[in-house]
């Protein structure tokens, strides 16, 4: 028997319930966040299917998304696997799990059909929807018909979010048919500009968070992760709305917000600047540095704010 320390996400209980319903339980591991996991799985004698199989990226097994059948493993291997992948899922945005009517071969074939997404200009892009920072945005961005296509063969989809919490993104009693590949591996899903923008914005937020953690590591580490992410997302969006769409100028704006718990950017001088922000980083940086001292003293740093949980 496992306990909460071995299986903090209760994956074994979920897999057992899936089996009792006559379904398969799968884990999906984005090994770009945990490189060379395929070697670990081989040493554990755990079967898997790579979603890169048959794709150009097939030559990169060390970073491939791997589909793992949990419900077909003996108790000991299942416990070892769950203990290991749970640690990975809490450490990096890499773990999701699926209940499906399909077997490993057929479910992997279905998921491979979403390796690329078409764009409105006729181009196609590799779609790393299995990165769990992107997965909820991907599900949100899809139209009703596209979502039905993507969730073919699925009864549920859940993942570990960026805050280390398990979230269910999809659950249904009705199973849609699995997708069928198009000739010449053409994308099954084409994103319009709005959908593409949602996915780009999600990537931009992570890029800005990474940059801020590099610039002020101690300060960002002092904040609860949810507080930091939600605060940065809100002020990045305000910067975008003012036409500040590059990460360097956004960093300067968000730093002012962080160092003043948001009060500094409400100062009339900053609001006036954001009506017509300089296009260059140097010009924008100089304009912020030239602000009166009261701007930078408008509020306490967010990490020293006693009202921040």
Please tell me what each predicted stretch does.
Residues 69-73, 82-89:
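Contiguous, structured surface segment used for ligand recognition
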Residues 91-95:
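Short, cationic low-complexity segments
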Residues 1-62, 67, 72, 78, ...:
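A contiguous, surface-oriented mixed alpha/beta subdomain in the mid-to-C-terminal portion of proteins
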């Amino acid at each position: 028997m496992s306990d909460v320390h071995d299986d903090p996400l209760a994956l074994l209980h979920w897999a057992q319930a899936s089996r009792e319903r006559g379904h398969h339980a799968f884990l999906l591991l984005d090994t770009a966040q945990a490189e060379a996991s395929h070697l670990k799985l081989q040493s554990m004698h755990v079967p898997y299917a790579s979603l890169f199989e048959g794709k150009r990226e097939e030559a990169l097994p060390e970073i491939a998304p791997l589909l793992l059948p949990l419900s077909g493993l003996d108790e000991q291997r299942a416990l070892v696997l769950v203990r290991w992948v749970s640690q990975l899922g809490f450490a990096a945005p890499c773990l999701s799990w699926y209940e499906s009517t399909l077997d490993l071969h057929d479910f992997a074939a279905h998921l491979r059909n979403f390796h690329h997404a078409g764009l409105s200009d006729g181009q196609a892009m590799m779609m790393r929807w299995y990165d769990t920072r992107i997965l909820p945005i991907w599900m949100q961005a899809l139209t009703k018909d596209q979502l039905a296509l993507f969730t073919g063969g699925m009864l549920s989809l859940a993942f570990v979010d960026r805050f280390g919490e398990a979230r269910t993104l999809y659950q249904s009693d009705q199973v849609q048919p699995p997708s069928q590949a198009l000739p010449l591996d053409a994308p099954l899903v084409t994103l319009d500009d709005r959908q593409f923008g949602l996915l780009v914005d999600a990537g931009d937020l992570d890029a800005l968070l990474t940059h801020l953690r590099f610039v002020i590591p101690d300060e960002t580490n002092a904040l609860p992760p949810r507080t930091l992410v939600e605060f940065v997302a809100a002020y990045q969006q305000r910067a975008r709305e003012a036409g500040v769409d590059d990460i360097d100028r956004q960093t300067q704006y968000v730093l002012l917000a962080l160092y003043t718990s948001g009060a500094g950017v409400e100062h009339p001088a900053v609001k006036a600047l954001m009506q017509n922000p300089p296009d260059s980083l140097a010009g924008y940086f100089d304009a912020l540095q030239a602000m009166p001292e009261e701007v930078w003293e408008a509020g306490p740093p967010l990490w020293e704010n006693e009202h921040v949980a």
